[in-house]
Curated annotation (Swiss-Prot):
Gene: ispE
Keywords, in A-Z order: ATP-binding, Isoprene biosynthesis, Kinase, Nucleotide-binding, Transferase
UniProt keyword Nucleotide-binding present: yes
Name the record gives this protein: 4-diphosphocytidyl-2-C-methyl-D-erythritol kinase
Keyword Metal-binding: no
UniProt xrefs under NCBIfam families: ispE, PRK03188.1
SUPFAM superfamilies reported for this sequence: GHMP Kinase, C-terminal domain, Ribosomal protein S5 domain 2-like
A GO MF label: 4-(cytidine 5'-diphospho)-2-C-methyl-D-erythritol kinase activity
Length: 297
């Protein structure tokens, strides 16, 4: 028997970042939107914990116990007095180290797959607790849809979305380390008073109404200057998307994937083609949002 779970990528339509906390994390007001790019995690009984991976960026995925999917299996097994003997196979379609929570998606997928395979019947609350221990974005990967994340992003309030939003994601050559981007944010903020992060009411209203034009006017990412400082060529990608008619262009999370909101599906296809023709990205992916969270297939 094996269990396969499909898990979406995410885009941050607002990422408001506070100053560094004593524990090194930052308080956030993080509005997540799950998008229709997916990884699939398959759990199969095995004699030991083993990770395999396929997909365009598979070579960049660690196959040892540092992999978040492996850590998820270990955490669930430890809570229930089990050995984490499972083969986790990741079919990877979410960009690696791209600011779209691909690793977090794999953790949420592995957690739900192992819970189903092992019959541990963890409550939603227990699964979310384990997710929060694994990383700030993992709880949202489990939940999907749209949500406001506070604290370091792990405390979620689900949000209403009144329609479908159409996105293009331009995948860069190379990755960005999330800790490095936060470190650059701290460096750029030195000597500056960083305000408390607060969710934008205009943005929440735009999501609830399904209004792409209003959402485009409200999107923001406080990590964008830091990501552009470390990866300056992303400015060219953002400009190419704007020139092609995107309603909004921003770095997705800590980058280096860039996200472009369009008016409709035809607009998304046109922006994707223009981005590819511009030579400013490795590939461009079209995806709608919102998308469901981790789902057993």
């Amino acid at each position: 028997m094996s269990v396969t779970v499909r898990v979406p990528a995410k885009v941050n339509v607002q990422l408001a970042v506070g100053g560094a906390r004593p524990d090194g994390f930052h308080d956030l007001a993080n509005v997540f939107l799950a998008v229709g790019l997916y990884d699939e995690v398959t759990a199969t009984p095995a004699d030991e914990l083993r990770i395999t991976c396929e997909g365009p960026d598979a070579a960049q995925v660690p196959l040892d116990r540092t992999n978040l999917a492996a850590r998820a299996a270990i955490a669930l097994a430890a809570r229930h007095g089990l050995a984490p003997d499972v083969h986790l196979h990741i079919a990877k379609d979410i960009p690696v180290a791209g600011g779209m929570a691909g690793g977090s998606a794999d953790a949420a997928g592995a957690l739900l797959a192992c819970d189903t395979l092992w019959g541990t019947n963890a409550s939603r609350g227990e699964l979310l607790d384990i997710c929060a221990e694994l990383g700030s974005d993992v709880p949202f990967s489990l939940v999907g849809g749209a949500a406001l994340g506070t604290g370091r992003g792990e405390r979620l309030r689900e949000l209403e979305v009144g329609g479908t939003f159409h996105w293009v994601f331009a995948v860069a050559d190379g990755g960005l380390s999330t800790p490095a981007v936060y470190g650059e944010f701290d460096r750029l903020s030195e000597g500056v008073r960083v305000p408390e992060p607060v969710a934008s009411q205009e943005l929440l209203d735009a999501l609830a109404k399904g209004d792409a034009v209003a959402l485009a006017a409200a999107v923001s990412n406080d990590l964008q200057p830091a990501a552009l400082s470390l990866f300056p060529s992303l400015s060219d990608t953002l400009e190419a998307g704007r020139a092609a008619g995107a309603l909004a262009a921003l770095v997705s999370g800590s980058g280096p994937t860039t996200a472009f909101l369009t008016r409709d599906a035809d607009g998304a296809d046109a922006v994707a083609q223009a981005l590819l023709a511009s030579g400013t990205c490795r590939t461009a992916r079209v995806a709608p949002s919102p998308a469901p969270g981790a789902t057993v297939l």
